[in-house]
Amino acid sequence: MAGGQIEKLVKYKSTVKDPGTPGFLRIREGMLLFVPNDPKSDSKLKVLTQNIKSQKYTKEGSNKPPWLNLTNKQAKSHIFEFENYPDMHACRDFITKALAKCELEPNKSVVSTSSEQLSIKELELRFKLLRENSELQRLHKQFVESKVLTEDEFWATRKKLLGKDSIRKSKQQLGLKSMMVSGIKPSTDGRTNRVTFNLTPEIIFQIFAEKPAVRQAFINYVPSKMTEKDFWTKYFRAEYLYSTKNTAVAAAEAAEDEELAVFLKPDEILARETRHKIRRVDPTLDMEADQGDDYTHLMDHGIQRDGTMDVVEPQNDQFKRSLLQDLNRHAAVVLEGRSIDVESEDTRIVAEALTRVKQVSKADGETTKDANQERLERMSRVAGMEDLQAPQNFPLAPLSIKDPRDYFESQQGNVLNVPRGAKGLKRNVHEAYGLLKESILEIRATGLSDPLIKPEVSFEVFSSLTRTIATAKNINGKNPRESFLDRLPKSTKDEVLHHWTSIQELLKHFWSSYPITTTYLHTKVGKLKDAMSNTYSKLEAMKESVQSDLRHQVSLLVRPMQQALDAAFHHYEVDLQRRTAKSGERPNGYV
């Protein structure tokens, strides 16, 4: 071990069954690096310490080799087999210290730098909010000054109050204009045949979005082979040749100029995207069946500008492009909108950003072999047409309804068919009546020896209920629209509202702290739990302190607050038991 790093000879395994790739492991405080002995091997690994979620290791003395299994935050495992246990323990201890340091440094920076980097304007805004809102000031004093919450935690949930200007600012992205790229008109000087195109960043973005081949050509040619001005000159020369519909001239110039041919030939990148989309279409949708509905082949129908009726030599067919293709592509790009949010005057940056976005979307859209198979199976199931299937005769249970009223009124028509001793039922009714009559006569003669409730207690309860009901009717009759909260004394009402606001604040921070992944969150949840317990006790004391005729209604007001706190307490206890049991099952840290 030298300075702030450690190096050991290990074997790297991507899975447990992997035989392993020999090499050396170098660990620093911020990074873990594995370099294989074979330079041609692709098992080189680089992991940031802050991305390591957990580490597991084999217990010394077991029959297993010394393995150290590191799991990152993406749930991917990296297994290292060491030559001996001391080397493994040395690396494990080094990683543990590095993880602890990575965990403490962000927390320290949040506490120290956030207050230092606060501008005077932000501090003035906070003080202004506290002065204008007495309830906010009371919450701040209750939780921040008592150190239940830090200053940053308290204001983190009130970003809307601190950033009203950002709220007023529209977050909607600007779309693309509906004007087509082919509609860009040049300006002329009136004396020569020279034309000038005025290219804005928006026009360039639209060209790159509609024509991937032009975007890729810009990345390949500018500035290595030509300047940006020469590039756009060739592009608009190609557009001019398209507009003349003279495919012979276009083919001749493309044969002489290799760079110009890129703009004149069909867009292969766009063609690949189209083929990929077609493969994902349900094969039961037969587009050829709709060709009979096409009227463009009839006289006086169709788009004459489309060029579909022009006679073109077969060898020049690749230099032909229809208006319909341009319209469809332009419509697709306009509907897609701006896929990137880059505001730069550098055309190359825009082109590269668009290319990266397309590559990411392509990677996301690629389906695996299993997913492809599932899609084909789903299509085969959908392809089955109901009118061509054999009739499905499901087994039916015949209904036996003697009287329709038995079915519609009691739905017990079949029950009547089962003999269940109707005569015995009638005889039992007479016996039960006789027994009840004898019991009543006996009670009249001797009385109840052991009453269920003492008469004094029952009289007191009924009297109290009578007074409460009479009072409630009297109060409710005065102002039906008035709520019970308005009838409470002002001090009690303010206390109830403050408790409700405090509980909302505590629960907001409590639930946002889960899952507990750091010591900082564990400490924060403990403070919040103690504060909620204190609030719970205050609620109980408040219920006992109110007048007896208001106690029931106050209990109804307080009950939702206590239920919310009980749910938080239950979650805290369950999570604590789970973490305690989990740590108890792994005394050596190995799962």
From Swiss-Prot:
Instruction: Report the main location listed first in the record.
Output: nucleus
Instruction: Tell me the GO BP annotations in alphabetical order.
Output: DNA-templated transcription; nucleotide-excision repair
Q: Where in the cell is it found?
A: Nucleus
UniProt GO cellular component terms: transcription factor TFIIH core complex
Q: Which Gene3D superfamilies match?
A: 6.10.140.1200, BSD domain (1.10.3970.10)
Identify the PROSITE patterns for this entry: BSD
**Which stretches make up the BSD domain?**
112-166, 191-243
Arranged from A to Z, the UniProt key words for this protein are: DNA damage, DNA repair, Nucleus, Repeat, Transcription, Transcription regulation
Extract the PANTHER family matched here.
Answer: TRANSCRIPTION INITIATION FACTOR IIH-RELATED (PTHR12856)
* Function according to Swiss-Prot or TrEMBL: Component of the general transcription and DNA repair factor IIH (TFIIH) core complex, which is involved in general and transcription-coupled nucleotide excision repair (NER) of damaged DNA and, when complexed to CAK, in RNA transcription by RNA polymerase II. In NER, TFIIH acts by opening DNA around the lesion to allow the excision of the damaged oligonucleotide and its replacement by a new DNA fragment. In transcription, TFIIH has an essential role in transcription initiation.
The subunit structure is: Component of the 7-subunit TFIIH core complex composed of XPB, XPD, TFB1/GTF2H1, GTF2H2/P44, TFB4/GTF2H3, TFB2/GTF2H4 and TFB5/GTF2H5, which is active in NER. The core complex associates with the 3-subunit CDK-activating kinase (CAK) module composed of CYCH1/cyclin H1, CDKD and MAT1/At4g30820 to form the 10-subunit holoenzyme (holo-TFIIH) active in transcription.
The identity of this protein, by name, is General transcription and DNA repair factor IIH subunit TFB1-1
The gene for this chain is: TFB1-1
